[in-house]
Each structure stands twice: as C-alpha cells, then as structure tokens.
C-alpha cells in the first residue's frame, strides 16, 4: 500500500482561472525540465497560452516533454498547434494514437486520462483540469468547474518517477530510442511544508485498483461526513456498499453530481443507482448551474482528494488516472467550503419521495441504460460480478 508522506505543501487551485496562471508561471520559471501529461490539449485561448509558455521554455534551453492522449489529440490538438509545439522545440508524444474506427481493440479504451505536470523536479500540478478554456464547453453551459493542486515537497518523487516511466514506455512501444530509463531511480525532495499527502495512480498492471482502494479505506473509516463531487458517477458494488454502510452508521454522505447530460448512456445508467443510495440516507445533489467536471472528495474534515479519476468503470477499470490524497485539516476545510458553496448555490436535491414516484418510462430507460453498460463492460472483459453482479438486492 502506498504510504502518506509528510512535509508537503499542497495548494488548491479552482478551475482554469487559478490553474492556468499558476501553471504558466511555473513553466516560465523553469530552468532545466518540464514534463506534462494531459488528456486534452486544445487549440483555444487557454491551450495556446500554455503552448506559448512551453515554447518559450524550450527556446531558452529547457527540456520540454509533452505526452498527450491519442484520442484527445485527434479531437482537440490541431495540426497547427502540434506543428507550433514541435517547431518550437517541444518533444511531443501521443499515447495510444490508434484512431482507425475499423480496427477496434479493447486496449484502445485504455486512455491517458490523467493531468500532471512537473517542473524542474521541484513543483508539480495534479488534478482534473485539461488544457482547454473553461468557457469552451461544447453542448454544455459554461464555465467548466474543476480543481487541481500545486504540489511541492517529498510527494514529488513518485510524480517524477511515474512520468519518466510512462514516457519511456511510450517510446519503447513506438520503437523510438529513449533517453529515459524504464525503471528510474527515485529522487529525494526536501520538505517544503507541513501537509501529509500521497500520489496514487491507476494503470493496467501494478496499480489497477489503488485509487479505488484509497477511497474505500477512507469511506469505511469515516465517522462524521463524506462529501464527494464527481462528474461521472457509476460506482461498483463495493463502492456503493461502502457509501451505504457509512450512511447507515450515521455518517452524513453527500454526492455532488452532474445534472446536465453529456454522455446519455452513462448519465441514465448512473441514475439507475439513485434509489438504492437514497433509501440508505445518502444525499444526492445535482449541479445545474454550469458544467461540473470535478473529481474530488472530503471526508471528516481531515482527508481529501483531488485528481483525474471519476468514480465510474472507465476511470476505475480502464484509464490511466492520477490523484493526490491529502491528510490535512486546513486543506480539507478549504475544499469542503468550496463544495458546500457549490451545493448551496447551484444544485437541486434529489428527493427520495419524488424519485420513487417517477414514471414507469423513466425507470425503464434508466435500467435499460444500466443494462447496456453492464453488458458492454462484460463483453470487454471488465468489471465482473463485483461491478455488475448478476444477483443483487432490488434497487428502486
């Protein structure tokens, strides 16, 4: 199990308005190296600002490396922006750039969904924010709401090693000569604060369930309050049982979920689970004010997480994800205040009585969606009985 490390400084960044200036400032201060991983690198106002900063760094001799997901690159990284980065001296790789629709393979679903950057092995950024403007929300009401953290201290060591290892792996499978070891030596980073934290990833080899396990460990020991904000929420059986058990032992459990429909199938499949959760006393607040993209949580005013991982089959079973977990009352309180304000000002609560009275057609649609997702995951070989059990208690 990955241990918490003391001596860190973790700064909460709220959406692009705080994240992009902090990231640009760190890039502009870089002296030796910049490593960046992202799912989306858009050719828009925000993406171009960061791209220009990366090129400036490369032009002054900084080793700049960008790893972008192949699907994200296909849909957002324009040829113009890609050319500008490469021509400016940025070393750019694409993770799984398979895009041919007639060559379907299960592995194509294993995307690079994490959003990480480290500069000079002294400061890092981890979170759920892609390199895309908050106001650039196709088919959704802007702005996009999300979180990231700026990190200094010993927890940088696994961040650096993780990024080096994946870069070397991508070069290896793409038959490129790599100057990065596949198994890098750990670095030593001096303490810079008083906060205890750990960096946790999900991959398809050694760390398949680590993010989920970190969540479950905190939920199962919660004593007072659990607040989870997640844009795409379709948890497996163990996760649901942990939330229900917490609510039944008197813990206040609140889920802040996206109300607006982005992916219809996942949206309605998620709602098929509402009845079971509501019956146990879990509070569900759907965010209507704008586009919720957050993947964060606070438990008992002392534990918090910020990262890229949703609580759904894609994030917990297939994609490469990364979260920071923090044990610190001050940080947890900061994030909790943000979430409670979002709940107070931008949500509608799902009332158990009204939910039970929804139309038969609505019930059928949600369960068909859930069934389609279940069958699809089974065909792909993911999930098994733990995620979609064949027999379960009746869920209303």
Predicted regions, residues:
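Charged, low-complexity intrinsically disordered terminal segments
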Residues: 1-396
């Amino acid at each position: 199990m990955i241990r918490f490390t003391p001596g860190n400084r973790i700064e909460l960044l709220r959406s692009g308005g705080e994240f992009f200036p902090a990231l640009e400032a760190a890039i502009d201060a870089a002296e030796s190296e910049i490593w960046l991983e992202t799912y989306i690198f858009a050719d828009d106002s925000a993406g171009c600002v960061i791209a220009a900063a990366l090129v400036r760094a490369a032009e002054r001799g900084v080793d700049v490396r960008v790893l972008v997901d192949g699907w994200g690159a296909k849909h957002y990284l324009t040829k113009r922006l890609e050319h500008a980065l490469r021509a400016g001296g940025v070393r750019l790789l694409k993770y799984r750039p398979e895009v041919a629709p007639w060559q379907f393979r299960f592995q194509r679903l294993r995307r690079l969904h994490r959003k990480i950057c480290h500069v000079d092995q002294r400061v890092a950024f981890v979170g759920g924010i892609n390199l895309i403007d908050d106001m650039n929300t196709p088919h959704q009401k802007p702005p996009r709401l999300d979180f990231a953290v700026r990190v200094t201290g010993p927890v940088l060591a696994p961040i650096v090693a993780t990024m080096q290892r994946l870069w070397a792996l991508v070069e290896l499978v793409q038959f490129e000569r790599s100057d990065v070891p596949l198994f890098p030596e750990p670095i030593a980073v001096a303490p810079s604060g008083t906060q205890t934290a750990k960096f946790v990833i999900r991959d398809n080899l050694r760390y398949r369930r680590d993010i989920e396990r970190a969540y479950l460990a905190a939920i199962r020991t919660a004593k007072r309050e659990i607040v989870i904000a997640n844009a795409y929420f379709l948890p497996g059986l163990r996760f649901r049982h942990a939330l229900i058990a917490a609510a039944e032992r008197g813990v206040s459990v609140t889920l802040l979920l996206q109300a607006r429909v982005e992916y219809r199938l996942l949206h309605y499949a998620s709602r098929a689970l509402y009845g079971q959760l509501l019956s146990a006393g879990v509070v569900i607040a759907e965010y209507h004010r704008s586009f919720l993209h957050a993947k964060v949580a606070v438990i008992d005013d002392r534990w918090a997480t910020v990262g890229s991982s949703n609580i759904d089959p894609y994030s917990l079973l297939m994609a490469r994800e990364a979260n920071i977990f923090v044990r610190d009352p001050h940080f947890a309180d900061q994030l909790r205040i943000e979430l409670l304000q979002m709940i107070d000002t931008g949500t509608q609560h799902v009332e158990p009585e009204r939910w039970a009275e929804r139309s038969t057609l609505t019930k059928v649609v949600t369960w068909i969606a859930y069934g389609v997702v279940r069958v699809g995951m089974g065909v792909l070989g993911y999930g098994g009985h733990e995620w979609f059990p064949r027999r379960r208690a009746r869920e209303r």
